[in-house]
């Protein structure tokens, strides 16, 4: 397992740019790694690559050379949008070169705890509300992921006093090796991104990577109304907190037509929830 302190003098390939690739490249460069960036966009039309070259980072643009990995890279950080069947990614895996995404890199270098939110629907709203509530309570949250600043950008400024609230896609979670949020949240699970993952099973496996490294000292909040989610949750080693909107439950978070409950005890009336719609009631469960 690579730790951030081990990245100095390591040869690292960043595959694909956009915001996440730029942030990962800059962070790795600051940590003393020997960084090479490879992006399909031609250099002349690639201001991100031009900016990285100006900082002393090696840039290869316009194509993905078949022999690229012959340079002896010890780690590949790929853009989440690049699939694992990409020839370079597949070749790296065959060579036993670790392949991670920017989220995993951010986790390796950050001193702050993470609250990770994923799901097919509702994750953006949930991430935003959690961030706003922590901010209102002066908890110094930082928002990252698919909304806000990319993960590596946030990790560079985070301290142990911060909490990183991060929205996570299945693309990002496929690259999990050590990522372990203090609190993991799964809002729901429906067919999505099958063009990328191939099957619902592969998509679900990626989503449940959010809890794969958690221990009983961590928390996994999940949608107990969905059988597939319950089956996966049973495999988690985290302290599990189920939620249901199908009536009062003695375990976890629940709701009926009038009230919200915690372990069977009423905590407030549904009528005080300003956001309308059943999906927003479920989003409130995570707070």
Question: Whereabouts are the PLM-identified features?
Answer:
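N-terminal leader/targeting and accessory segments in enzymes
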Residues: 1-101, 105, 272, 282, ...
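Short beta-strand "acidic-cap" motif of Rossmann-like dinucleotide-binding folds
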Residues: 35-39, 143, 165, 242
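Local beta-strand/beta-hairpin segments that build beta-sheet-rich folds
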Residues: 31, 182, 265-269
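Cofactor-binding loop segments of dinucleotide-utilizing enzymes, especially the Rossmann-like FAD-
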Residues: 17, 39-40, 120, 146, ...
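Adenine nucleotide phosphate-binding catalytic loops in nucleotide-utilizing enzymes
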Residues: 10, 15-17, 55, 79, ...
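Short, flexible coil/turn micro-motifs enriched in small/turn-prone residues
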Residues: 4, 11, 16, 114-117, ...
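Phosphate-binding loop of NTP-binding sites
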Residues: 30, 66-73, 80-224, 228-238
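A structural connector/turn signal
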Residues: 2, 209, 274-276
């Amino acid at each position: 397992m690579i730790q951030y302190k081990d990245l100095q003098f390591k040869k690292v390939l960043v595959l694909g740019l956009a915001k996440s690739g730029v942030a990962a490249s800059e962070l790795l460069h600051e940590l003393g790694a020997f960084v090479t960036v490879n992006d399909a966009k031609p250099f002349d039309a690639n201001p991100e690559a031009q900016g990285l070259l100006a900082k002393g980072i090696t840039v290869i643009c316009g194509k993905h050379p078949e022999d690229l990995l012959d340079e002896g890279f010890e780690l590949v950080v790929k853009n989440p949008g690049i699939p694992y069947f990409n020839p370079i990614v597949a070749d790296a895996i065959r060579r036993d070169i670790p392949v991670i995404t920017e989220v995993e890199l951010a986790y390796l270098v950050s001193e702050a705890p993470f609250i990770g939110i994923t799901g097919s629907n509702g994750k953006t709203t949930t991430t935003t509300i959690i961030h706003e509530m922590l901010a209102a309570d002066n908890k110094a949250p930082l928002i990252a992921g698919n909304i806000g600043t990319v993960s590596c950008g946030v990790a560079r400024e985070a301290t142990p006093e911060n909490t990183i609230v991060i929205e996570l896609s299945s693309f990002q979670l496929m690259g999990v090796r050590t990522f372990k949020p203090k609190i993991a949240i799964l809002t729901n699970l429906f067919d999505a991104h099958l063009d990328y993952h191939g099957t619902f099973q592969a998509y679900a496996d990626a989503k449940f990577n959010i809890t794969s490294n958690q221990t009983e000292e961590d928390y996994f909040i999940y949608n107990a109304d969905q059988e597939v989610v319950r089956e996966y949750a049973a495999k988690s080693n985290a302290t599990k907190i189920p939620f249901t909107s199908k009536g009062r439950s003695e375990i976890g978070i629940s709701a009926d037509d009038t009230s919200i409950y915690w372990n069977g005890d009423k905590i407030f009336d549904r009528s005080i929830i300003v956001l309308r719609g059943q999906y927003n009631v479920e989003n409130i469960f995570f707070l």
